[in-house]
Amino acid sequence: MEDYYSFEQVSPDRFEESNIEDYDNFEQVSPEREENVMEFPNEAYADLMELFIKHNLNNKTGNAIIKFFDKHSNLSTSPLPKNIEAGRKLMDIMNVQKLPYSKHCILDYKNKEYFVYYRPIKSCIESLLSNPDIIKNFIYKYQFLQSDGETLYSEQYSGNWWKNAEASIRPKAHILSIILYSDATTTDSLGKSSLHPIYISLRNIRTWRRNKEDAKQLLGYLPILSANNEGQTSKFKRLARETFHNSLKFLLDPLFDEDGIDFKINNKNIWFFPRISTVIGDWPEACTFSLTFKSANSNYPCHFCQTHRNDLTSIRKDCIIIRNKENMQEYYNNGSAESIGLEQVYNYFWTIPNIDIYAATVPDRMHHLDLGLFRYQIEYTKELLGKSLEDKMNRRIAIIPRHPGLKIFAKGVQSIA
């Protein structure tokens, strides 16, 4: 996976370094593993791992705590793991009920209860806002940036989205721009156990600071239904989609049930209006959020637009019809959602004001390459840039120093397409 500088492009493995996403599936632990469920060896061990998770510490910090304790405890045998990795591996094969997450039953299906394991979303945001270094790099208001007479768009708070969002709220309030990231993850080498973590961060935080591990919070784990022999049936697939969106409703509703929310920053109450601005995930995950079909072979495979797959190679920009809340909800209400590659399931995000879930999702490079869309995106980009900017980009590419493993498009950006 590539190591990106932008949080918007961060890959799943970057998240997997930070805290507890390697746990076994709460719902799909195999019977033989249930028989061998363990507990932490002692209270000190349990307290350490709870501290590690609660404060979203990285491995380096956790190991420093262990080293400090062992040095000053004067105990012949340390009650702590030799390092944080050992503690995480132990949690891979044990019951994690002691960790500071609550659970809520979201579905009872075929005599089995499915739970959302979660931290309250307000608590996650409060944890971010309690970090003094994050607050130093926290933006409250839209910023209009210019250089040499040209408008600059460097962060979301300098773009039109923020400007328009700010105009829609009370004058003394502030926008709280929320990023959601989720991805179903296999947690064992055999691929038999999986989890569906969901994370939260804030686009109010400058990008370089947001890329650090402590600038994101694990909101919880979404349930993964046991398919057994019905995984391919339309009824089961619909139930899985409904469960996903019901889980999101449970997690996110507390942000939208009031006239904005007060959060304390530097001992002052600041009035915010939360807005979900970005949903990060791969292409199948984007399909789950937007409830479009999860197949590149479906007639309408794009979760952004209503372009038939046979037209992807010849579509003109003026023929593209963008998906949005209004036209997708109309198909749903008419019972014809499937005719446009949409699941006949109510989308939770239709109930949230000021969010277009189809625009909030981000392009996924790998699956777009699989679909063959990338070359057309390059063509559109070239047309938008114009000849002068295309030449300028080519000149910049040409002066990039060569390095082993670094791909340089020596023939210019047009060679990519």
Residue ranges of each PLM-predicted region?
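A structural signal for the principal folded core domain
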Residues: 1-417
